[in-house]
């Protein structure tokens, strides 16, 4: 069947082409609810996700964004073991109740306890009689190890075993806090009726609950985290390891999600993991979204070529302007009762509001977080200013590191035979990710207040766009003035 007669299908819009029309509002910005449910086990308190890029999201970024209420996607440019370890770091960074605490036996060496404590940045380890029966017999903490000279000595010689303070399984955080304070201790092991170790509550975790009240967490009180996989020979092995490490979702990450090979692989992944949350992309059309949902995906990622470091649209001549792509995919998502993530092209907080208004349930951001302390990119000084490296996953360097399969070039062994669809660059250093999130949320709340939307669903239903001319875009930015003091949420690109 020929598509000749519809070759020039329609006009496409991106963020700089449109503005949201202000409307009658009974909503103040501080009253806006930013919660978004992407899947049954994936409810975020803010609609922000950090990209699965090797200069954006490792465990530090994932922890920071989850504490703010969003979600980080651990990139896959590392071994399966390393990526699974990154997921574990996030899941163990914060717990309401630690349901699977580390433990050792009295026969283990002190050095093994120290290694465990340093690797996971914990201050103590429960000690059980045997690995099989898990009967609690003691605990060893930093204080017990402070003056030890022989780290080859068995833990039994240095652990605290008398007057152990414990609590029953099911103890709530309020009761645990009272017990910890009363006995001046930092860790409270939870035991069952047989004295078996069944959990652990720490004062640090209680403090984190208070410090980060909006953190995005799973049913066990652990931070939410996702991780990326490709469509390769190790996909199932990697996905298995990531889920075992605690990942709440995997992101099947390809440049063209509406591809027969990708769809077959996704269907196989769904069959292999029938009850797990699958996010997949990228696509830019309604048909692409439909194909992914039919293959078994829970959440579709939308965006081909809009990213600041992506060259797909000029190298391959392919893509759909992002606002149109979001709107088209969202129409299908509504039909299926599922959700989409708008991935790429966002420069300002106002673009986030536009992406959500067009039908997005959350946005995925790369460049806006690449300059933060938590991003894994290297810091460098250029002309007296501080920058961090930022590169597309389609850049030569990233493809050599492991992302070539994303662009269907996994079989290419020579760097000079790779055809990149991204570039390497630098972005200005921005400080803590939490500061960036604060400004973003302020902008989102303000935009939703202007259009009278109390939550994201109301934004979907009621927001209206106006097409903007080139002169309108110029008028939208500061003009006819020299900026002398940049605002924290606006800079000239």
Curated annotation (Swiss-Prot):
One Pfam family recorded for the sequence: IMPDH
Gene3D superfamilies: Aldolase class I (3.20.20.70)
Gene Ontology MF terms in the entry: IMP dehydrogenase activity; metal ion binding; nucleotide binding
Catalysis performed (reactions): IMP + NAD(+) + H2O = XMP + NADH + H(+)
Protein keywords: CBS domain, GMP biosynthesis, Metal-binding, NAD, Oxidoreductase, Potassium, Purine biosynthesis, Repeat
Activity control summary: Mycophenolic acid (MPA) is a non-competitive inhibitor that prevents formation of the closed enzyme conformation by binding to the same site as the amobile flap. In contrast, mizoribine monophosphate (MZP) is a competitive inhibitor that induces the closed conformation. MPA is a potent inhibitor of mammalian IMPDHs but a poor inhibitor of the bacterial enzymes. MZP is a more potent inhibitor of bacterial IMPDH.
Pathway annotation: Purine metabolism; XMP biosynthesis via de novo pathway; XMP from IMP: step 1/1
Chain positions recorded as K(+) binding sites: 305, 307, 310, 475-477
Domain CBS: 97-155, 159-219
PROSITE patterns for the chain: CBS, IMP_DH_GMP_RED
Catalytic residues, chain numbering: 310 (thioimidate intermediate), 406 (proton acceptor)
Enzyme class label: oxidoreductase
pH-dependence annotation: Optimum pH is 7.8.
Residue positions binding NAD(+): 253, 303-305
Chain positions recorded as IMP binding sites: 308, 343-345, 366-367, 390-394, 421
Biological processes, Gene Ontology terms: GMP biosynthetic process; GTP biosynthetic process
Listed cofactors: K(+)
Enzyme Commission number(s) of this protein: 1.1.1.205
Cited InterPro entries: Aldolase_TIM, CBS_dom, CBS_dom_sf, IMP_DH, IMP_DH/GMP_Rdtase_CS, IMP_DH_GMPRt
Subunit structure: Homotetramer.
Family of the protein in this entry: Belongs to the IMPDH/GMPR family.
Role, per record: Catalyzes the conversion of inosine 5'-phosphate (IMP) to xanthosine 5'-phosphate (XMP), the first committed and rate-limiting step in the de novo synthesis of guanine nucleotides, and therefore plays an important role in the regulation of cell growth.
Protein name as annotated: Inosine-5'-monophosphate dehydrogenase
